[in-house]
């Protein structure tokens, strides 16, 4: 009887939620405790995220770019100002030049699509100028912060949408290594700054990538007020 009960409990705990949570935290107790939470495809996609840097030598299906950008534009945006832009790069020669600015990362060359996310105050400045407004608010650091936030929200929607379609991707922070060079290559105006790039493609099934574990929630999650983390948790 006891062994049967143990088996039943084990089967109950062997759920998609439990598997995804264990992969993300490597914490059996935590994963088992949340094994019966409500689950859906959206959560499964989000919690399965991993960076993909190796792709099949295949183009993306027609309409994929536009669908990804529709997902990106569905993200939250500060006061609906939409202070971001994205540049889709598919030309191999341009990708090679951009890769040279970003530590020559091979996946920039290999991916069929490279997206460059831009914190874009230039468009708002242009609108202000056309309407004869001074656009004073654009001179404050707050404007740059919300432009970065808008670009980041859009990018995260993009990668989640891509993964939901069976695609893979990888953020490229090294696109900030040479801001002037990247801006010149992409013909960026003043007040438009690259925040990061993102490669998108069909993952190479022969080269797997693992889900990387994250810090324990007790380090990241603060309830009511900020509290310094337990040093033992940081050491782990």
Regions found by a protein language model. Give the residues of each.
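Acidic, surface-exposed loops and disordered segments
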Residues: 1-236
């Amino acid at each position: 009887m006891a062994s049967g009960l143990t088996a039943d409990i084990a089967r109950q705990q062997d759920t998609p939620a439990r598997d995804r949570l264990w992969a993300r935290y490597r914490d059996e107790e935590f994963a088992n405790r949340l094994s019966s939470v409500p689950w859906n495809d959206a959560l499964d996609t989000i919690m399965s995220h991993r960076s993909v840097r190796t792709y099949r030598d295949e183009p993306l299906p027609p309409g994929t770019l536009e669908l990804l950008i529709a997902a990106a534009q569905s993200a939250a945006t500060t006061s609906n100002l939409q202070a971001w832009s994205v540049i889709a790069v598919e030309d191999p020669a341009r990708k090679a030049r951009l890769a040279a600015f970003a530590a020559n990362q091979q996946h920039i060359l290999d991916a069929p699509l490279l997206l460059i996310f831009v914190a874009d105050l230039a468009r708002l400045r242009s609108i202000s100028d056309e309407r004869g407004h001074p656009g004073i608010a654009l001179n404050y650091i707050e404007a740059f912060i919300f432009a970065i936030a808008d670009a980041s929200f859009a990018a995260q929607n993009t990668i989640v949408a891509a993964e939901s379609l069976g695609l893979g991707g990888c953020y490229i922070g090294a696109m900030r290594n040479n801001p002037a060079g990247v801006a010149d290559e992409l013909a960026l105006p003043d007040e438009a700054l690259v925040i990061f790039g993102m490669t998108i493609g069909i993952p190479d099934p022969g080269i797997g990538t693992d889900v990387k574990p994250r810090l324990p929630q007790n380090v990241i999650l603060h309830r009511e007020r900020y509290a310094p983390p337990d040093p033992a948790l940081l050491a782990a």
